[in-house]
């Protein structure tokens, strides 16, 4: 079981697995709030998603509507001083072309924002496999991969090939300096990067 030290004076760019404005805050939100309160500069990047659901999925239109509302907020500052941003992306990840377009779009947008906000040598905290293409592109000092789901098994939320999601997940495991699992079962089933893997269980933040 890992207890994260509370440090200060660092820069953190977190690619969350969901939008900051989601009605049920996830563990990444609580962690980033604590880091910001401790005196760290934090940028939280709203979910760049695993792709949109299929056209037949009833969640397609609500997902698009929620994402458009996030885009409308642009870069916003929370009460804790966290910069929350929804970068423009192409919502399809099944092809090399679309992934290349996305990581270039995001690299430019987040890189410029980090420079304006004074972030240097950030800790890159990724909580979704599609952020793996950003590793090595934001001048980061450390890469943390926060695993909170079996991403390739969650096919209800997107139409992307599970095999592609699995490949991205395995790349993230191979390239991360530190891997945090939010569940004991997820950690028990892990096969890659075990020497860098730790359990960070979710809890209620009062």
Where are these regions (language model features)?
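A conserved catalytic-core segment of Leloir-type glycosyltransferases
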Residues: 5-6, 50-121
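An aromatic- and histidine-rich active-site surface loop
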Residues: 29, 103-107, 123-138
């Amino acid at each position: 079981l890992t207890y994260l030290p509370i440090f200060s004076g660092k820069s953190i760019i977190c690619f969350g697995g969901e939008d900051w404005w989601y009605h049920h805050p996830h563990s990444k939100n609580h962690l980033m709030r604590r880091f910001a309160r401790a005196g760290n500069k934090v940028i939280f990047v709203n979910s760049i998603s695993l792709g949109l659901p299929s056209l037949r999925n009833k969640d397609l239109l609500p997902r698009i509507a929620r994402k458009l509302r996030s885009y409308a907020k642009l870069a916003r500052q929370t009460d804790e001083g966290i910069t929350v941003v929804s970068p423009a992306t192409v919502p399809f990840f099944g092809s090399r072309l679309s992934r290349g377009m996305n990581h270039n779009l995001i690299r430019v947008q987040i890189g410029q924002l980090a420079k304006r906000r004074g972030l240097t040598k950030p800790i890159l905290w990724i909580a979704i496999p599609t952020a793996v293409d950003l590793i090595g592109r934001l001048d980061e000092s450390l890469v943390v991969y926060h695993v909170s789901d079996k991403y390739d098994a969650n096919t209800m939320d997107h139409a992307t090939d599970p095999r592609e999601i699995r490949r991205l997940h395995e790349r993230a495991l191979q390239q991360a300096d530190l891997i945090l699992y939010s569940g004991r079962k997820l950690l028990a089933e892990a096969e890659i990067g075990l020497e860098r893997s730790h359990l960070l269980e979710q809890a209620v933040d009062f």
